[in-house]
Amino acid sequence: EKQPKFDYSDIKFKDNGKLKLIIVVGTRPEIIRLAAVITKCRQYFDVILAHTGQNYDYNLNGIFFKDLKLAEPEVYMDAVGDDLGATCGNIINCSYKLFVQTKPDGVLVLGDTNSCLSVIGAKRLHIPIFHMEAGNRCKDECLPEETNRRIVDIISDVNMAYSEHARRYLADCGLPKERTYVTGSPMAEVLHNNLAEIEASDVHRRLCLEKGKYILLS
């Protein structure tokens, strides 16, 4: 059984003079939505990609790095615990240790998963936090994602909303306008970058489906 990783003395930035950025992911949606962003960030910044291990099955994780032509993460935290409390605690603890030992200039997260709670440690260490998909609300406080997104929105230094509607939610929370930007969704770039592979896919044959004759539910 894997144990959470707390020692990151083997993880180093390249120290190439570029901004040192840690991107934290942990689930399939984050990997997909951030694919184009990760590629662009690696072009302009000194990047460490850290995976919390929230989704650790190959079909929910590894296959997407392969299909989206992304390099494997530099860090696997293996933060999944025996229950929700242990997992959330491990994510915060592992991330805090990673930030202390690598000293990034910024931390980027997307969305509202438990992996986004990694930024709590960044806030305590006064590391700037960049939050994509900020301002989303479902108004159901029983959902754990609603709690996560409210926490991350409030403590982030830069909130990147997908829409003007989401930006207004951030304003209603009291966040100043200089901390919020409407950037749109990065999924358009992900689809554009992978359009040839999507059109050439044999998934219909493999799943015995006929185009236009099925409904996809997720």
Predicted regions located by residue number:
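N-terminal subdomain of nucleotide-sugar transferases
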Residues: 2-54
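A nucleotide-sugar donor-handling region in carbohydrate enzymes
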Residues: 2-9, 54-59, 78, 155-218
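Glycine-rich helix-loop-beta junction characteristic of Rossmann-like nucleotide cofactor-binding loops
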Residues: 13, 99-101, 207-208
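Gly-rich Lys/Arg/Thr-decorated short loops/hinges at beta-loop-alpha junctions or inter-strand turns
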Residues: 17, 72-75, 218
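Phosphate-coordination loops involved in phosphoryl transfer and adenosine-cofactor binding
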Residues: 18, 104, 211-212
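Active-site and donor-binding regions of nucleotide-sugar-utilizing enzymes
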Residues: 22-25, 30-37, 64, 76-176
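Structural beta-sheet core signal
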Residues: 23, 49-51, 109, 131, ...
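Conserved nucleotide-sugar phosphate-binding/catalytic loop shared by glycosyltransferases and other
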Residues: 46-87
